Amino acid sequence: MSEHDSDVIFAGSIPKLYEQYLVPSAFEPFAGDLVRRLQSRHLTHVLEIAAGTGVVTRALAKMLPSTVEIVATDLNPGMLEQAQSIDMKRPVQWRQADALDLPFPEESFDAVICQFGVMFFPDKAKAFAEVYRVLPHGGVFVFNVWDRIEENDFPNTVTKAIAPLFPDNPPRFHARVPHGYHSVEIIERDLTAGGFTSKPEIEVVTRESRARAPRSIAMAYCQGTPLRNEIEGRDELLLGDATVLATKALTERFGRGPIVGKSQALAVTVVK
């Protein structure tokens, strides 16, 4: 398996650590913002793709009327397992699905939503074409992507901190994948290639990421994301060392805790 193949694997202990450490600091601050972009619409069926451990699914369940049917999908069974272990307070249909080949008929959802998942799709235009296919005319696709890593304090600090462990080939997962798809021109191009003809609304959204202590963030990024696969692929014995280095760098920059850092994303809304 190549390094780039491991970019999309959220397995083993990653889903639990992801939910425990990464979701509260990185994803919860943006989940409500994304769902609010759907609230003014009359909806009956909503599809979530790349749902992960369900942080946006929980926001959908809380913020949308109880009459709206929610279907949540993810490529990784381990992430869905973790998501289903958390009470949603209302029925949600969970399905394993590849965003590049959605197992749903044409025009079957009023809206499709995706939080911080698009960056992982190997063929974004194809994924957008699948979203386009399952939406009716007037249906809406809302998603967000991380802005460049330099605008996001915690992953940027972690990425720089662990680089000296691997001087010949530093792990760049976060810069390459989660923070590697932020060009407005490229996003618009890929949406057009996927069939969308209306101009997307793209908004910069800035939030604060918070954690009780630097180690929580070090655990989140080093062990709760595919960066772990990248580190262990180089030397599995250095995962602990990488986490220690990241903790030290975060402590030096943000203090011993609780800590606060800037997070920035792009929120995209496009209508079929």
Q: Each predicted region: which residue ranges?
A:
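A short SAM/SAH-binding and catalytic strip from SAM-dependent methyltransferases
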Residues: D110-K124, D147
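Conserved class I S-adenosyl-L-methionine
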Residues: M1-T44, V55-A59, M63, M79-I86, ...
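Class I SAM-dependent methyltransferase SAM/SAH-binding core
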Residues: H45-L102, A111, K126
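Conserved hydrophobic residues forming the short capping helix/wall of the S-adenosyl-L-methionine
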Residues: A61-L64, D87, I162, L191, ...
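Short amphipathic alpha-helix with an adjacent loop that forms part of the alpha/beta core around
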Residues: F104-E106
